[in-house]
């Protein structure tokens, strides 16, 4: 029996749109980029200190490999980093990446807090007693008397061109208040 060109479609089974059977094609370049990203993540982990590593959810094998890479130099380190990248490919890296991002974010938040405290200190010295209620709103535990004394001393030092001792004391006092609040 000779089939017509349209008849060959009758022999092909219909696609039932099964998403489970669908094969997702990934290019070799994308696989390499993913592997390189995991290797970079491993490098970031190796560059962290011991205290920071304790805050990241790592299993014993991966932690041992990271600690070994921290001790190794030159070519051995490169090979160890490749091994760490390979180990990361076999694991769920999302919790590790999240913890690492939190560590980086904490550092950025601390820098941002210091900038805010410096601005507040400068405002206290420039405006004097008028800016103290702002500090008391932000930090209810603040001692008004001590703050007024520090501001007055800083203004006197600034007028006399003396070293900024009270200037630094205001900042450290504000930093203590911010740490208590957190």
UniProtKB/Swiss-Prot annotation:
Protein name as annotated = Dual-action ribosomal maturation protein DarP
Q: What's the source species' lineage?
A: Bacteria, Pseudomonadati, Pseudomonadota, Gammaproteobacteria, Enterobacterales
Determine if rRNA-binding is one of this entry's keywords.
yes
Q: Which GO terms describe its cellular component?
A: cytosol
| PANTHER family listed in its UniProt record | UPF0307 PROTEIN YJGA
Is rRNA-binding given among the entry's keywords? yes
Q: Name one GO biological process term.
A: assembly of large subunit precursor of preribosome
So which residues are the signal peptide here? none
What is its biological role?
Answer: Member of a network of 50S ribosomal subunit biogenesis factors which assembles along the 30S-50S interface, preventing incorrect 23S rRNA structures from forming. Promotes peptidyl transferase center (PTC) maturation.
């Amino acid at each position: 029996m000779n089939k017509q060109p349209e008849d060959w479609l009758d022999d092909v089974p219909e696609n039932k749109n099964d998403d489970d059977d669908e094969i997702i094609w990934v290019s070799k370049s994308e696989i390499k980029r993913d592997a390189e990203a995991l290797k970079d993540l491993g490098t970031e982990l190796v560059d962290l200190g011991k205290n920071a590593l304790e805050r990241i959810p790592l299993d014993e094998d991966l932690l041992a490999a990271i600690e070994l890479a921290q001790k190794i130099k030159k070519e051995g380190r490169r090979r160890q980093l490749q091994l760490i990248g390979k180990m990361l490919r076999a694991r769920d890296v999302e919790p590790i990446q999240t913890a690492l991002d939190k560590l980086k974010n904490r550092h950025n938040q601390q820098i941002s807090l210091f900038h805010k405290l410096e601005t507040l200190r400068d405002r206290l010295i420039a405006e004097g007693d008028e800016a103290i209620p702002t500090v008391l709103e932000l930090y209810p535990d603040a001692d008004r008397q001590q703050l007024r004394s520090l501001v007055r001393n800083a203004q006197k030092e600034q007028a006399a061109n003396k070293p900024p001792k009270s200037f630094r004391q205001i900042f450290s006092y504000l930093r203590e208040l911010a740490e208590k609040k957190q």
